[in-house]
Amino acid sequence: MKGALLVLSLAFSLLANAAAPTPEDRLSTVFQAIEANQPDVALKRIDALIQDHPNFRLAHLVRGDLLLARGRPLQTFGNVAKTVPQEKIDDLRDEALARLRAQRQRPSEGRLPRLVLQLHPQQKHVLVVDSGRSRLYVFANADGRPQLVADYYVTLGKNGIEKTREGDQKTPIGVYHVTANLPRGKLADFYGAGAYPINYPNEWDRRMGRNGHGIWLHGVPAALYSRAPRASDGCIVLANPDLETVGRYVQVGLTPVIIADEIEWSDAETVEAERKSLAAALEQWRAAWESRDTERYLAHYSARFSSGTQNAAAWAAHKHKVNAAKSWIKVGLSQVSMFRYPRERDFVVVSFEQDYRSDTLSNAMRKRQYWVREGARWKIIYEGAA
């Protein structure tokens, strides 16, 4: 038994200390007892865990192994009767391994996700999903920088990630935000403790021809504690207690949700240098617009630019016409956020409050731009209302 579960024990021992131990924390203490060759202690702990969370199927599998180990050595994790479908056992093994990998590969102190360059002051948290680890990380906004506060096991699409069409049972990759809070009382039991829809497809998804809808963060049916790592129709699924905790961090309309293949962790200095580079480009764009030097302004736009209704040529013609009629322009930017786009090289989503004033028009709006590095310069490839 010790040999069969030693690796799990070592991994789960790395779980963060919490004021109130989560079921995952308690499972780690079971494996610690197994590693210490204390099977009776392990069995007592797993029984207590199952009593409190009788729908935690992975815990039942571990208990079965503990009982079997009394009579014979275990050759592998999940030794159960052949009457149990192998697919169900494989799902539980996959869940155990996903939890294991996440705990063994926790980020070092001081490392930051390269995906998060800047949060604006009203965004209290950002949620980042590492699909390779089946993990959702919650980061707090610490003066614009992300600070890791918690992480949770999640279930993703049956057919993996990078959703492209309706019904493909894949989870999208991209930068999104929570659009609503759907409470338990308004949903079927399937969605568990509630749901938080996100804005898939976003502007870039639509430009790339991706379709579909109804991608939510949600819970699980009451009969379950958790699901296999790849079991949803594309949604991000958490255990109900975890969803309830994550819900306390969510601000509808504000909380970003970034879904990636994996999180690349970096030092704070590197992330800050990347942020400053893009912030400088954004300021140069703003100043060029104010200057009414239209060619200088348009130099910030890629030849591949599209607003969704205008390509680069149409956009240029429109801006020449508009700016020629202005005597002065003032542009103010505030509440700026910057997020790298997963799986795209040097591609960043920038959102901000824009206060535009001229001799003929005053307008305030929230704007979103997609910036791409072309050679040595950052350029805008999409711009529109957020």
PLM region descriptions:
Residues 122, 320-368:
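Surface-exposed, charged secondary-structure patches
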Residues 364-386:
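Short beta-strand edge/turn micro-motifs at domain boundaries
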Residues 21-48, 52, 284-287:
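Alpha-helical segment of the N-proximal tetratricopeptide repeat
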Residues 180-283:
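Exported/periplasmic cell-wall-interacting domains
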Residues 30, 274-292, 300:
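Short, aromatic-enriched amphipathic alpha-helices that serve as compact interaction elements
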Residues 104-215, 220-226:
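Gly/Pro-biased beta-strand-loop elements
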